[in-house]
């Protein structure tokens, strides 16, 4: 019996070491990865005056439950973006990954004057139009590791993530202040009544 406990503990320790080593290697690879360079090049090439923007990798995951009766289904949808930002101005370039190849679409522009409201919650930034209808939600995180087909990049972007957080805070204050929004919850509720 004691041998089984010792073997079990040893297996857990070995598994922990393997996972830790993999995470550490992925983080080191992501600090100056090919994917990070591609994101910066995409921003430079497709965003007007792209070199004047901070470039980052952004994602959005949407998890939903559905079904009825005895059947419950879960759906997770993923979006990937090259994010370009500077004070008062945001571009999102949709990305797609197919068999390791990175492709991109036309950039979407969101200037502070185009937005009706911005909400920040738990690291997510949600943009709303002038009628306070949700446009989209995204987040930029410091560590992205290639875990599976739904997490396809190794990109470490601590400085960019911190800069995006400051940008998002500033954009929220500017946009909400310009549109007379002091209570986001009340503004959302009023928009639903329309």
Model-derived features: where do they sit?
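Anionic N-terminal interaction surfaces
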Residues: 2-5, 13-87
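Detector for Asparagine
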Residues: 3, 41, 45, 122, ...
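Charged, low-complexity, helix/coiled-coil-prone segments
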Residues: 13-14, 104-116, 159-161, 165-172
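Short, flexible/disordered intra-domain loops and linkers
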Residues: 24-31, 100, 148-155
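Phosphoinositide-binding peripheral membrane targeting modules
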Residues: 74-79, 86-141
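Terminal and domain-flanking low-complexity segments
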Residues: 131-134, 141-194
């Amino acid at each position: 019996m004691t041998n089984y406990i010792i073997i079990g503990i040893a297996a857990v320790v070995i598994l922990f070491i393997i996972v830790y080593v993999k995470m550490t290697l992925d983080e080191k690879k992501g600090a100056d990865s090919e994917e990070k360079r591609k994101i910066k090049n995409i921003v430079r090439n497709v965003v007007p005056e792209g070199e004047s923007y901070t470039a980052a990798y952004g994602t959005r995951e949407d998890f939903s439950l559905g079904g009825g009766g005895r059947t419950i289904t879960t759906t997770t949808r993923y979006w990937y973006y090259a994010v370009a930002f500077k004070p008062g101005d945001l571009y999102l370039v949709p990305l797609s990954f197919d068999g390791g190849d990175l492709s991109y679409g036309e950039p979407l522009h969101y200037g502070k004057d185009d937005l009706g409201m911005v909400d920040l919650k738990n690291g997510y930034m949600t943009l709303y139009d002038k009628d306070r209808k949700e446009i989209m939600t995204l987040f930029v995180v410091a560590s992205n590791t290639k875990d599976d087909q739904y997490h396809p990049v190794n990109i470490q972007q601590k400085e960019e993530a911190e800069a995006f957080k400051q940008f998002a805070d500033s954009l929220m204050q500017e946009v909400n202040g310009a549109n007379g929004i002091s209570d986001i919850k009340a503004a959302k509720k009023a928009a639903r009544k329309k």
